[in-house]
Amino acid sequence: ITEAGYEVDGCDDVRCFVESGFSNKDVLVFPLWRGGASRNRTAIVPAYCEARNIPFIRGDAYVQAVCQDKSLSKMMANAAGISVPGEMVLQSEDDLSSFSPSSRLRGPFVVKPLHSACSIGVDNSSLCHNDDLARDRAANLFAEGLGPVVCEEFIEGEEIALCFIEEQGTIVKRCVGTYMGIDGKSPF
């Protein structure tokens, strides 16, 4: 961006952004902030931009809130006719004592934070082949402050990303991306 002749300012938190006076400048905001413990953390900057009529790149506050909630986004995908894996949501550590994913789901299971993106809280221990491993992984996520937790059926295959560019209510560009490992194969 700077090579194209534009000035780039960065803020480490929402307060810095709000107090910076960006609303008084001719700007375009790239809301990449992912901090804080709120499940709405990716929606905060877009919501502020919308309220102040500051142009920004990425989904609006509603899109961010839906996409951050893995269970809600799967429910919406299912309502649109897209098959989704079965899941169980653990809202708190109190749910761990009765957590037995094999009673409702086909293994193996993927256990990860319910409200995160960018693979936050996902590592090799997220793929769990039995109830004990799933319970341990969920307990670790709660201990790391990454709860609520979702446990879902593992679906082998390519990871697909759908991208849309919208201008004033009209989709003007679509793209589909698939994730491949360095060997050119799907790692899943």
What are these regions (language model features)?
Residues 17-18, 117, 158-161:
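Short, active-site-adjacent cap segments at secondary-structure transitions
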Residues 22, 64-150, 156:
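Active-site nucleotide/adenylate-binding loops and adjacent lid/helix of ATP-dependent enzymes
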Residues 53-55, 106, 168-171:
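Glycine-enriched alpha-helix->loop->beta-strand junction motifs that scaffold or abut catalytic
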Residues 2-90:
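Conserved N-proximal alpha/beta basic substrate-recognition cap immediately N-terminal to
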Residues 11, 32, 112, 152, ...:
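A cross-family glycoside hydrolase active-site/sugar-binding cleft signature
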Residues 131-188:
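Phosphate-binding site of ATP-dependent enzymes
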Residues 29, 56, 87, 111, ...:
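Generic preference for hydrophobic
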Residues 35, 93, 114-115, 155, ...:
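Short, flexible active-site-adjacent loop segments at beta-strand->alpha-helix junctions, enriched
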